[in-house]
Amino acid sequence: MIIDMEKVQELIEAPLSREELAVRYRDLCEDPLFANVPGKIEIDPWGRMVMSPPGVYHGLVQARLARVLASLGGETMVETPIATPMGLFAPDVTWASGQFMSTHGRENPLMAAPEVCAEVVSPSNSVKELKEKTEAYLASGAHEVWIVYPQSKRCEFHGTQGPLERSAYAVDLAGLFR
């Protein structure tokens, strides 16, 4: 067998496109070595896997937030992969309208962000990382990005025009941090 070395890519020379990230993610999903990996997998712009297993309280807040968002109708999803211009990320919780789901519901990963993307902050998160994810979700079509801080029991809301005083989505977050 002769290998055409012109076609062999040994190094990644530039950040991957959304489409290339999507292919990389689907390949990982189909790889038996990753079938039972606990926690979510994200892929940075260079195609590297990033794994961030959550703690118990993080999971509780995530589940409560999913229940709250379910009151809006539509679909609530957890750790759903989204291919963005800045990497493939899996927000802790997302909410999508029926219209969004009819257009994008069968994609794996999603090639656009649902209307609401929420990140539940973990001690390992950095301000820079959260800012980048917020920008990535908004650039991919999210209407709002919620940053949920379990330790300080607060939420930040971001829209396409910047920080929001409150969310445009009428949900009761009072029981989120009990």
Walk through the language-model features, giving the residues of each.
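Gly/Pro/Ser/Thr-rich low-complexity, intrinsically disordered segments predominantly at protein N-termini
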Residues: 1-178
